[in-house]
Amino acid sequence: MPEVLNPILESDPKMQPVVPAQRPGQIYRRILVATDFTAASTPALKQALKLAKQNHAELLIAHSSTEPASLSFMSADSYDAWEKQCRTEAEQKIGALIQQARKEGVKAHMLELSGLADDAIVEAAEQLGVDLIVLGTHGRRGFSRFLLGSVASQVVARARCPVLTVRSS
């Protein structure tokens, strides 16, 4: 801990350091990479796989299904069919990614998330003891980013572990 903080922290036992704890050499043991199966997430998947391989880390490949905007107009049967189709497609795509990771000697698992992506990613990372979150980003700025929101910026702001954002081309 920096020497400057010691007198401050010692004067009030309720105060906590704002400097995140660092591990020697910062070796990652559990890496979570989130994908939405778009081109923006491909470079993040590649980088996460590379880091997992280098660190002999476990790779958690996560996907969060988002509900369709027309949800209020769907019948219960239509919603159930849509949800089942989305889950099946995600399982197939993540299954292929897991096979690729295992071919490269990386222990990989699927992590199915539900709810808003940023909330689900942060919560899963905390519950599972993730050392690093890797996210793809589209690189939009200004008004475009404001309109669309940014899962990556929300995760960066709220995660308790390091977050690596990988910009797509």
Model-found features: residue ranges?
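Gly/Ser-rich helix-loop-strand patches that form or flank binding pockets
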Residues: M1-A21, E123-S169
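Small/aliphatic-rich secondary-structure junction motif
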Residues: P2, P20-D77
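Short glycine/serine/threonine/alanine-rich loop segments
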Residues: L51, A57-E58, V106, V130, ...
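Conserved beta-strand positions in the Rossmann-like core of class I SAM-dependent methyltransferases
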Residues: L60, H109, L164
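A short acidic, glycine-rich active-site loop
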Residues: Y79-Q92
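A short helix-to-beta-strand connector/capping loop
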Residues: A101-H109
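Charged docking surfaces used in two-component/phosphorelay signaling
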Residues: E112-A120
